[in-house]
């Protein structure tokens, strides 16, 4: 792996300051993968999101409605973490598939095995009234193939808009991946929010989380156009191809690979019920507890390709653009 010096990771899409056209050869690369990587990706993003709500005084006393939650193994860690902090949360986990048995028998967790529609969303809202709702959505439908089609995505995003409209949550974390430009159908609308990148996503995943906190006014919508899709594809490929394959040499941590650097900045914001001498000690404690929970082995930094020559990834001249590639970024989860 090549090396780089960075002050902070690209936490949000708007912070990505370069772009790169897709190279078809990337599809043949063997992806490095951790066990339970999908659960790790979800756990880190949701722990960061819920800790942010805790910081703003929004989390305590809320009901987390998680639609598309199965198998939900990682949710047990989230539940236990906030329970041990004394934060009062109820969980309603809804999916047409069955959940991990590790979630059975918890008084503050309700498991629902069904898919949602508008009628059922209205019944949830009535059932939970007047509780404040925090919505997490990981809905995903695939009618064929390895990835959802553009039709699938548009259907999912329309459903997520209905969720927001009916449930009227105080905050939400929604699944978000822009359709690829070469599969474009039509412009559409999504809720206004921050598009958060995800450490430990698959190598060329273009998926993010759309985070929003609502302050009482009507939901604001953002129009997504084909021009946005082109921009999104190039920036996400740059993030995945260039940035995520770096070792961060000025990052003092047992594993200096970029995804661990990204994880560090997420976990440093998380509250704990014990004190630590340094932020690094706290993050190590949290990482080890998460990896232990998910049975993920601890690894050290992969061997670098060259001697450490420090360079800034953010330099606009560091990547050649317009490589005349017509293929889209591929990788959804």
Curated annotation (Swiss-Prot):
It is found in: Virion. Residues 169-249 are annotated as: Binding to NPH-I. InterPro entries: mRNA_MeTrfase-like, Pox/kineto_cap_MeTfrase, Poxvir_cap_MeTfrase, SAM-dependent_MTases_sf. Residues 169-333 are annotated as: Binding to Rap94. The active site is at residue 175. It is an enzyme of class 2 (transferase). The keyword Transmembrane helix does not apply. S-adenosyl-L-methionine binds at residues 39, 66, 68, 72, 95, 97, 116, 138. Interacts with poly(A) polymerase catalytic subunit OPG063. Interacts with OPG109 and OPG123; these interactions might help linking transcription to capping and polyadenylation. The keyword Plastid does not apply. MRNA binds at residues 22, 177-180, 182, 205-207, 233. This is Cap-specific mRNA (nucleoside-2'-O-)-methyltransferase. Keywords: Elongation factor, Methyltransferase, mRNA capping, mRNA processing, Protein biosynthesis, S-adenosyl-L-methionine, Transcription, Transferase, Virion. One of its GO terms (molecular function) is mRNA (nucleoside-2'-O-)-methyltransferase activity. Its EC number is 2.1.1.57. Its main location: virion. Displays methyltransferase, positive regulation of the poly(A) polymerase and transcription elongation activities. Involved in the modification of both mRNA ends and in intermediate and late gene positive transcription elongation. At the mRNAs 5' end, methylates the ribose 2' OH group of the first transcribed nucleotide, thereby producing a 2'-O-methylpurine cap. At the 3' end, functions as a processivity factor which stimulates the activity of the viral poly(A) polymerase OPG063 that creates mRNA's poly(A) tail. GO terms for biological process: 7-methylguanosine mRNA capping; methylation; regulation of mRNA 3'-end processing. SUPFAM superfamilies: S-adenosyl-L-methionine-dependent methyltransferases (SSF53335). One of its GO terms (cellular component) is virion component. It catalyses: a 5'-end (N(7)-methyl 5'-triphosphoguanosine)-ribonucleoside in mRNA + S-adenosyl-L-methionine = a 5'-end (N(7)-methyl 5'-triphosphoguanosine)-(2'-O-methyl-ribonucleoside) in mRNA + S-adenosyl-L-homocysteine + H(+).
């Amino acid at each position: 792996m090549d090396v780089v010096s960075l002050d902070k990771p690209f936490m949000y899409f708007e912070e990505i300051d370069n772009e790169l056209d897709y190279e078809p050869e990337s599809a043949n690369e063997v992806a490095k993968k951790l066990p339970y990587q999908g659960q790790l990706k979800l756990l880190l993003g949701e722990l960061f999101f819920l800790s942010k709500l805790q910081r703003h005084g929004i989390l305590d006393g809320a009901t987390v409605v998680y639609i598309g939650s199965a198998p939900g193994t990682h949710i047990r860690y989230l539940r236990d973490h906030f329970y041990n902090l004394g934060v009062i949360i109820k969980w309603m986990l809804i999916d047409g598939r069955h959940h991990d048995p590790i979630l059975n028998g918890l008084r503050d967790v309700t498991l629902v095995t069904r898919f949602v529609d508008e009628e059922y969303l209205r019944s949830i809202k009535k059932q939970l009234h007047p509780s404040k709702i925090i919505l997490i959505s990981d809905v995903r439908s695939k009618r064929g193939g390895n990835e959802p089609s553009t039709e699938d995505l548009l259907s999912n995003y329309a459903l997520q808009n209905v969720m927001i409209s009916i449930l009227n949550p105080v905050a939400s974390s929604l699944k978000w991946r822009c359709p690829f430009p070469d599969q474009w159908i039509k412009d559409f609308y999504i809720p206004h929010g921050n598009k958060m990148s995800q450490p430990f996503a698959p190598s060329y995943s273009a998926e993010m989380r759309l985070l929003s906190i609502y302050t009482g006014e009507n939901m604001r919508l953002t129009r997504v156009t084909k021009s946005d899709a082109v921009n999104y594809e190039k920036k996400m490929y740059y993030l995945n191809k260039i940035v995520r394959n770096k070792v961060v040499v000025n990052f003092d941590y047992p594993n200096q690979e970029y995804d661990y650097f990204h994880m560090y900045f997420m976990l440093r914001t998380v509250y704990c019920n014990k004190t630590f001498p340094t932020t690094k000690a706290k993050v190590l404690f949290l990482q080890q507890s998460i990896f232990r929970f998910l049975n993920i082995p601890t690894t050290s930094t992969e061997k670098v390709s060259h001697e450490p020559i420090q360079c800034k990834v953010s330099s606009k001249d560091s990547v050649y653009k317009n490589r005349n590639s017509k293929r889209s970024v591929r990788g959804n989860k």
